[in-house]
Amino acid sequence: MAAQVNGDDNDRQITLIDDQGNEELYEVLFTFHSDDYDKSYVLLYPAAVGDDEDIEVQAFSYDADDTGDVTSSDLHEIESDDEWNMVQGVLNTFLDDDRLSGK
């Protein structure tokens, strides 16, 4: 999956480009690093989603730059069930904690 990063640290957007060359703009929900997997992860949601719509969050691992940020490098699909379970647990913690999710 190819990606292009636009914006600054407060308003990061990523354009995902699928195998057919279709582009879709996503907002960065948050990023984190897992010491267990020694990888950085980014969670994204579609930029065009309305406030009252359910959103589908997508997660990828990525190669962080020197400051730990998402770069324009390729995103990597998460392939193992254990890794998906870890990412889902982090997302659930984020969504359940009002201080983190901004509820």
From Swiss-Prot:
Coiled coil: none annotated. InterPro entries: UPF0473. Pfam families: DUF1292. NCBIfam families: PRK13678.1-4. Belongs to the UPF0473 family. This is UPF0473 protein LBA0420.
